[in-house]
Amino acid sequence: MIRGMSNLKESSDFVASSYVRLGGLMDDPAATGGDNPHKVAMLGLTFDDVLLLPAASDVVPATADISSQLTKKIRLKVPLVSSAMDTVTEARMAIAMARAGGMGVLHRNLPVGEQAGQVETVKRSEAGMVTDPVTCRPDNTLAQVGALCARFRISGLPVVDDSGALAGIITNRDMRFEVDQSKQVAEVMTKTPLITAAEGVSADAALGLLRRNKIEKLPVVDGHGRLTGLITVKDFVKTEQHPLATKDNDGRLLVGAAVGVGGDAWVRAMMLVDAGVDVLIVDTAHAHNRLVLDMVGKLKVEIGDRVQVIGGNVATRSAAAALVEAGADAVKVGVGPGSTCTTRVVAGVGAPQITAILEAVAACGPAGVPVIADGGLQYSGDIAKALAAGASTTMLGSLLAGTAEAPGELIFVNGKQFKSYRGMGSLGAMQGRGGDKSYSKDRYFADDALSEDKLVPEGIEGRVPFRGPLSSVIHQLVGGLRAAMGYTGSPTIEVLQQAQFVRITPAGLKESHPHDVAMTVEAPNYYPR
């Protein structure tokens, strides 16, 4: 028997206790016919089935503290995480999410080296001090330097000799008017002596050197002149521009990445750790599985607390308990709620998301393990409901897929802009394209399919309206969450988790949306269904 399994009686007891929190309006779920009163375990509720009850409040929405735990050891200033989907999160989205106060999770539907390279891109995008800066040699060509700068989106490189000693620096200004790209760096670079800083320099002292000498890059060297780091003026500017940014102890942006349980899963995980990833998500459609539990446990033994490990996805209390027992630092909840997911229709399996969150929290809460609500979130109010149900953070797919930072293809239809968006269980995600292999199949335990025309998809491909920059979308989502905290008298997410729901009827849902009027101007945070 899989560890962490609980009996239906235990599950029913919890549901009965949760009825009170949901308004006490539920009929006896056992009265469903047949001889087994526990055959139907519970009534499943999702976001459209409930509303948060307003409460006495002295909370001004703008002052509410929306920070929350992502994992046992990582706290986000904004409880939003972008989904590990190939039309949602690559390096550009991960950088933007971290700067906004959340975090991005890089998808795994690409070769191992490319995913690790995207981790490096995020980690190098800004830092208090780059401790392992990209460098070049004096005998490199300008073409080689240009390729490195383009790959890492940087404007120049320190030049070091074979011993690692600083020999000079080369920047865009040095190369801008050079036509011959076969020239060596030594012919063009600014040679030593350069303005440098000693190891251990403080941020204030480094900023002073940059200002006084009107330079943009400050190499850090040891007592023997060997390069040990690089400080750039852009990092100080970025810190001022993005005060909520989620960073590690070295001032670098936080980033997560998804791994599976298939053939290359362990190699992928170790390469991501070496690249500097902060969070690994063992990302499958059904985490209450021996392969997933063993992978979570093995990762925790190997890397300890150096990298946080999240397990998912689950929809039951027993599954969440199994992940907690395996050592997961957070549990991701959601079997079939996503807009592009067809698992509940194809397999007939799943649990409505509010109930799934409540069940997972019952197992994770006493253990101090945060819950991540993944999927089914259509409006900012759904984020508030997910957190009120006990989740600590939310993972977003469709809400972010239409942003400029999402990697989906931009499409024009009848003069309107859309972006492609697909589930990771869709045929497009699970089938290879040309010489490109799909790495998504094992998420649905379908990597043993004899041929791609034998795949059984659990997702669809579609498009979502183009929403513009991520920052605008995040502003609206955070604004809705803050409004909910004001209405419920919740100064923190932890207090919001104690808010009470009321169950509503289909008529109540209809009343909740705009009605009896024709919309003439679109609101930035409401999209008719």
Curated annotation (Swiss-Prot):
Its EC number is 1.1.1.205. Gene3D superfamilies: Aldolase class I. The active site is at 341 (thioimidate intermediate), 443 (proton acceptor). Pfam families: CBS, IMPDH. Coiled coil: none annotated. It catalyses: IMP + NAD(+) + H2O = XMP + NADH + H(+). Its cofactor is K(+). Residues 129-185, 189-246 form the CBS domain. The keyword NAD applies. One of its GO terms (molecular function) is IMP dehydrogenase activity. IMP binds at residues 339, 374-376, 397-398, 421-425, 458. Pathway: Purine metabolism; XMP biosynthesis via de novo pathway; XMP from IMP: step 1/1. InterPro entries: Aldolase_TIM, CBS_dom, CBS_dom_sf, IMP_DH, IMP_DH/GMP_Rdtase_CS, IMP_DH_GMPRt. NAD(+) binds at residues 283, 334-336. GO terms for biological process: GMP biosynthetic process; GTP biosynthetic process. K(+) binds at residues 336, 338, 341, 511-513. Mycophenolic acid (MPA) is a non-competitive inhibitor that prevents formation of the closed enzyme conformation by binding to the same site as the amobile flap. In contrast, mizoribine monophosphate (MZP) is a competitive inhibitor that induces the closed conformation. MPA is a potent inhibitor of mammalian IMPDHs but a poor inhibitor of the bacterial enzymes. MZP is a more potent inhibitor of bacterial IMPDH. Catalyzes the conversion of inosine 5'-phosphate (IMP) to xanthosine 5'-phosphate (XMP), the first committed and rate-limiting step in the de novo synthesis of guanine nucleotides, and therefore plays an important role in the regulation of cell growth. Belongs to the IMPDH/GMPR family. Homotetramer. This is Inosine-5'-monophosphate dehydrogenase. It comes from Mycobacterium leprae (strain TN). The lineage of its organism: Bacteria, Bacillati, Actinomycetota, Actinomycetes, Mycobacteriales.
